[in-house]
């Protein structure tokens, strides 16, 4: 069920990001290697909304945590993080908590350096790491989300 929700969430992200003025969003499709899906892409989406260029990976999580090791695109996202005007990160839907959170890849880097194994939903309130809740209005299953919050983050996010 989580896989189905995850794919549907990716589509909902695309729809909601596209609502931003002059936004452009492109889906990078995963490649097949035999029977296994192997992504060589840096992210699910490449997005643009003046003045920022985004590499966004979308993840759906049932519980309180998202494992740092579950982010297979970590290295490729990190390569893109330190370019002025360019942002790389993960949009995580904690669906049991009805929260959508943006976590910059630089936060994943800091979590690893600090010996943390996962992003916990509670970290949002602790404010020890850079992450931001995406303003969202609950629908039946999904949300209408306002990704303009990503345009207001400081450089390095």
Residue ranges and their predicted role:
Residues 1-36:
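Acidic-basic catalytic patches of nuclease active cores, encompassing PD-(D/E)XK
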